[in-house]
Amino acid sequence: MQEQYNPSEIEALVQKHWHDNKTFEVTEDANKEKFYCLSMFPYPSGRLHMGHVRNYTIGDVVARFQRLQGKNVLQPIGWDSFGLPAENAAINNKTAPAPWTYQNIEYMKNQLKLLGFGYDWSREIATCTPEYYRWEQWFFTKLYEKGLVYKKTASVNWCPNDETVLANEQVQDGCCWRCDTPVEQKEIPQWFIKITAYAEELLNDIDTLDGWPEQVKTMQRNWIGRSEGVEMTFGVAGSDKSFDIYTTRPDTLMGVTYVAIAAGHPLAELAAQTNPELAQFIEECKNSTTSEADLATMEKRGVATGLYAIHPITGKQVPIWAANFVLMNYGTGAVMSVPGHDQRDYEFAKKYNLSIEAVIKPVDGELDISEAAYTEKGVLFNSGEFDGLDFDGAFNAIADKLVAEGKGKRQVNYRLRDWGVSRQRYWGAPIPMVTLADGTVIPTPEDQLPVILPEDVVMDGIQSPIKADKEWAKTQVNGQDALRETDTFDTFMESSWYYARYCSPQADQMLDPTKANYWLPVDQYIGGIEHACMHLLYFRFFHKLLRDAGLVNSNEPAKQLLTQGMVLADAFYYNNDKGARVWVSPLDVVTTEKDDKGRVTKAIDKDGNELVYTGMCKMSKSKNNGIDPQVMVEKYGADTVRLFMMFASPPELTLEWQESGVEGAHRFIKRLWKLASDYVAQDNSEALDVSKLTSEQKALRREVHKTIAKVTDDIGRRQMFNTAVAAVMELMNHLQKAPQTTGQDRAIIGEALTAVVRLLYPIIPHVSFTLWNELGNTNSIEDSQWPVVDESALVEDSKLIVVQVNGKVRAKITVAADADQASVEALGMADEQVIKYLDGVTVRKVIYVPGKLLSIVAN
């Protein structure tokens, strides 16, 4: 065995073995328990970053652990390879998105292999290939036939200069990123999938996701946003028109003093015909943001329409205002405003001098709305026949009255909107719909699928090549001329079903149900919590669509979800001659001084610039604080990088990148290597004989088996990989101090090392593979079994008891494991140190905590 640990040499050899033996390629096996481990697949941006490495190391640790449990483990990988970044890169590099994407895939694939991840590469998929998106197109046509797909107009960002649609990322400070023209909102026809048809099931089934983090489940519940309320009809004074409003607080109905409607509401547009100020306001709203996050923080503005609404119970007339905080595509596009009991309505009423009336008061205490609205539930007053009712009583009484008079109905609403899947981009899967010469819109016939996206294109940075090329859209359907849809799918479409395609990636159908139902659902899914409300919701939705199409027989796509934390690194900058910040990579910082608490007080880069240290923050290109994994692998080896990633932090928390920690991980592996090397060099022919062991040898063996038990629980149940590593490190300290003089000494070290390399195999597989062989095992470590705890080794012959006198530790005594209190007391009282502290005093009380503590109280 080589004395020195040489990571680059052993990692290349081990990776070649895995490749040549197709170690991680699996097929269905009804005789073995399956385990499907999946990490969210990467976008092929060009290079892996440390966030990828953390995600994929966690996944690989879980997969390798389960493999050694004897399970049939599937761990696939692929590429989420459509999307806007490829278009931008193609424009900048004067190429097309396809070659840029495929080149990146090859580079990143090599990086993944260098890190030693045990993927079944025979199942690799790239979502930008027709072999993949063909089935997505096919499934979309089936959803259309089931009535789950429809087309309607929706708002997009429009650049009037380039006459093109912009993604949100291409709008910078309200202007086009390319030509700096102010961006407008434009209504264009787009395709939607009815996720709202599954809202109730998506919400209810969250309760079945026992293996998902509570935070993710709460975020999804809030995103789906089920509410119970009343939809009521308000008349419009002086006309036969009416409009509907939904509220979850009908108890406040008697306090309505105005109604707010969206700028795009038909009533606002009607009133604007004779109101220039309103017309201008509507135009401004059209070109402003419509995201809920922005609405919450932006200035609330409005214009009176001159119209009045008729209160459905009192008949009182209240003014109708067009307001920028009401969205036409959310709810009914109108809200009843109760400034006495809603803070936003209160601030708007104060700003425009509108009436504020209180109709709810606290059960106890005084009502005060002089500075703010009273928004709590309470008791009604100033509400006529409803006075004195609490929230529930008022809700029911007012709802019943509105229903009885034909002016309202009880209703369950969801915050969730239907999924708009149209994108006016090029690099995406073409939407498989065609428009016939007579204007009829139908799905592309199955025998014409896939609708292939041309890859040999020129990007002008303005218009999608398939929109610019009028010939591409022309086709024939059933002998008739037709035009193809030139929008492409939202890339969340591809990532919503990729996990299922891995089960049968070569199948000449969307899924092979037999294979899919063997592997699905995913047993362990790993990815960032930032995907909680988009990808992870569409992922669940698509699984239900697949189930209802008869392709899978489970209700949910993944049993367990682990959301790993971000990777942070130090960030440094200096100000250049123009006062602009220049961010410097931590790898280029050559001098740092720290205070006694370890905080950086001074830093200088390799060019001599004195730097400002801004602390730890998420690795990013903008702050130039990303650490290239490849640089670290070349310097320390893949196993060291993997070990640091698992040891530095619990998986759900942020991980602070510290090269000193990486160096520590490297030293630990070298210690393990040396211990194994020293052991292998000796005569280890004597077999372990438990009956011959001394108490010291039994104690060391007990530590080995306690470590096996802890690591098994930490990785398998708790998923606390950092404490698993810490436990092995602690055991290593014991092993390094242990004598290797006798045959039984070495037999225990041998048992310990064969356990340790298997315990660490999921985390540092190259070293473990090599040491397993060096320790004389004839089978491959991948075909071995996870170490099993010898329960008899955990049984202690003796216990160490702490002896206290008046609350202070005065001695530690060793007693037989089965010693009773009288025996322990006798031994404790006979200890020299204890005798000294009891001299001249009277023992008043003795407390014994079995197996742990003897406490003597004396005065």
From Swiss-Prot:
It catalyses: tRNA(Leu) + L-leucine + ATP = L-leucyl-tRNA(Leu) + AMP + diphosphate. GO terms for cellular component: cytosol. ATP binds at residue 621. Its main location: cytoplasm. A motif ('KMSKS' region) lies at residues 618-622. InterPro entries: aa-tRNA-synth_I_CS, aa-tRNA-synth_Ia, Leu-tRNA-ligase, Leu_tRNA-synth_edit, M/V/L/I-tRNA-synth_anticd-bd, Methionyl/Leucyl_tRNA_Synth, Rossmann-like_a/b/a_fold, tRNAsynth_Ia_anticodon-bd. The keyword Cytoplasm applies. Its EC number is 6.1.1.4. NCBIfam families: leuS_bact. Belongs to the class-I aminoacyl-tRNA synthetase family. This is Leucine--tRNA ligase. It comes from Shewanella sp. (strain MR-4). The gene is leuS.
